[in-house]
């Protein structure tokens, strides 16, 4: 299936914005101001070709979470292509078959048996979010915490709630509740109905890694606002989409991703999906 690139929006850190616009110093005189604007446009245009591959500050996404909620499950991008945009991330696979987790450049498909299978490059994804992970902030977690408490702790250490963050937590867990969803057949059910057949796994006294993202509230409909985490065991053998956890201690790392690039399906069910609805209740049902 052909893929068409859409640059949805570009978010730059304040220091970058200041640098780009430093040429616009005042309103007196048209020549300097016009020159500054032209150089700004050129700077942004020159940046676009550089952000599609191998950029640690780019969060790259395939399709939207609302499209997935509405049952747009046909894969549109091979994992071999997805790997050129990141070595860390989460998502799902063609037909909603299992949970995707990428860590240290290795991609895994966690199926309904809870096993994490290494992924071949030919399998496709209908929805995924990836980046090249480079930690900007690190924290030591010494106290036990449930999922909500862990998220609150991370929130307290965010430079801003308005940026995108890749989140990695290595730790010891007394309990992890995770899930995976079986492959769906057409006509596809919406995701809130498809998860009724999910498999739930419970891990006890296990070491492993949480992989995921924290996205701002203003991307509702595009991605999952707040935290979206998947889990994989330390030996990379099992895991799933995180529903609940009890963490004993660990190390957290945040990667600030100040640029957001999204690729949308160029045909298929996405074209006719009734996007723009308020699907918050469905999202909460699916995520919890």
Curated annotation (Swiss-Prot):
Supply the name of the protein.
Answer: Alpha-acetolactate decarboxylase
Keyword terms? Acetoin biosynthesis, Decarboxylase, Lyase, Signal
Coiled coil (UniProt feature) = none
For this protein, the record's InterPro entries field holds: Acetolactate_a_deCO2ase
**Domain of life, per the record?**
Archaea
Per the UniProt record, which EC number(s) apply here? 4.1.1.5
Range of residues in the leader sequence: 1-23
The UniProt function text for this chain reads:
Converts acetolactate into acetoin.
- Reactions that this protein is recorded to catalyse: (2S)-2-acetolactate + H(+) = (R)-acetoin + CO2
Q: Give the family this protein belongs to, as stated in its UniProt record.
A: Belongs to the alpha-acetolactate decarboxylase family.
The record, for CDD domains, names: acetolactate_decarboxylase (cd17299)
Q: What is a single molecular function from GO for this protein? A: acetolactate decarboxylase activity
Q: Give the organism the record lists.
A: Methanosarcina mazei (strain ATCC BAA-159 / DSM 3647 / Goe1 / Go1 / JCM 11833 / OCM 88)
The UniProt entry's GO biological process terms, in alphabetical order, are:
acetoin biosynthetic process
Lyase: present as a keyword of the record? Answer: yes
Which pathway does it operate in?
Polyol metabolism; (R,R)-butane-2,3-diol biosynthesis; (R,R)-butane-2,3-diol from pyruvate: step 2/3
Checking Pfam families in the record gives: AAL_decarboxy
Q: What class of enzyme is it?
A: lyase
Q: Which PANTHER family match?
A: ALPHA-ACETOLACTATE DECARBOXYLASE
């Amino acid at each position: 299936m052909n893929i068409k690139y859409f640059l949805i929006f570009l978010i730059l850190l304040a220091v970058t914005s200041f640098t780009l616009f430093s040429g616009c110093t005042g309103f007196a005189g048209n020549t300097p101001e016009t020159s500054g604007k032209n150089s700004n446009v050129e700077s942004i245009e020159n940046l676009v070709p550089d952000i599609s591959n191998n950029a640690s500050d780019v969060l790259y996404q395939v399709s939207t979470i609302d499209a997935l909620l509405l049952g747009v499950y046909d894969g549109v991008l091979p994992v071999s292509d997805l790997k050129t945009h990141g070595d860390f991330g989460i998502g799902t696979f063609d037909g909603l078959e299992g949970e995707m987790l990428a860590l240290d450049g290795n991609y895994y498909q966690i199926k309904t048996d809870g096993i994490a299978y290494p992924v071949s490059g030919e399998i496709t994804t209908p929805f995924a979010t990836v980046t090249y992970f480079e930690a900007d902030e690190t924290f030591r977690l010494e106290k036990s915490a449930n999922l909500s408490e862990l998220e609150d702790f991370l929130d307290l250490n965010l430079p801003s709630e308005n940026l995108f963050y890749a989140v990695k937590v290595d730790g010891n867990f007394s309990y992890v509740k995770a899930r995976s969803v079986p492959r769906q057949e057409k006509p596809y059910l919406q995701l809130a109905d498809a998860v009724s057949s999910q498999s739930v796994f419970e891990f006890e006294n296990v070491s492993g890694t949480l992989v995921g993202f924290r996205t701002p509230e203003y991307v509702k409909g595009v991605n999952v606002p707040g935290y979206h985490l998947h889990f994989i065991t330390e030996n990379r053998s099992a895991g799933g989409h995180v529903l609940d956890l009890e963490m004993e201690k660990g190390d957290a790392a945040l990667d600030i991703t100040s640029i957001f690039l999204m690729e949308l399906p160029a045909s298929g069910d996405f074209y006719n999906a009734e996007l723009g609805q308020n699907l918050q209740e469905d999202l909460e049902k699916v995520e919890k």
